[in-house]
């Protein structure tokens, strides 16, 4: 596949936040912002993918006009950022999470 053909086939770019795209908790570099804009200009969806919950994605990302979706909770939820509503979830049941927490508590 030629490089130009591969570029045309890209439909979505998902990116991690902590220690990669962001510096600190909520600082987006100008270089990263420009790269996201360039992808958006090429009709590529630009999607943050993070272990964070939706409300902890910083405004420096959610206020960008081209950030429409976000994958949160380590892949457990997909959000429509513009509508601020969850599109789908696949979360661990609370009782299972509590059982796991209890196991780890024994190792503190």
Regions found by a protein language model. Name each.
Residues 1-15:
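Non-catalytic pre-domain segments flanking phosphatase-related domains
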Residues 24-28:
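Conserved ATPase-coupling elements of RecA-like P-loop NTPase cores
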Residues 30-108:
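Active-site phosphate-binding/coordination module
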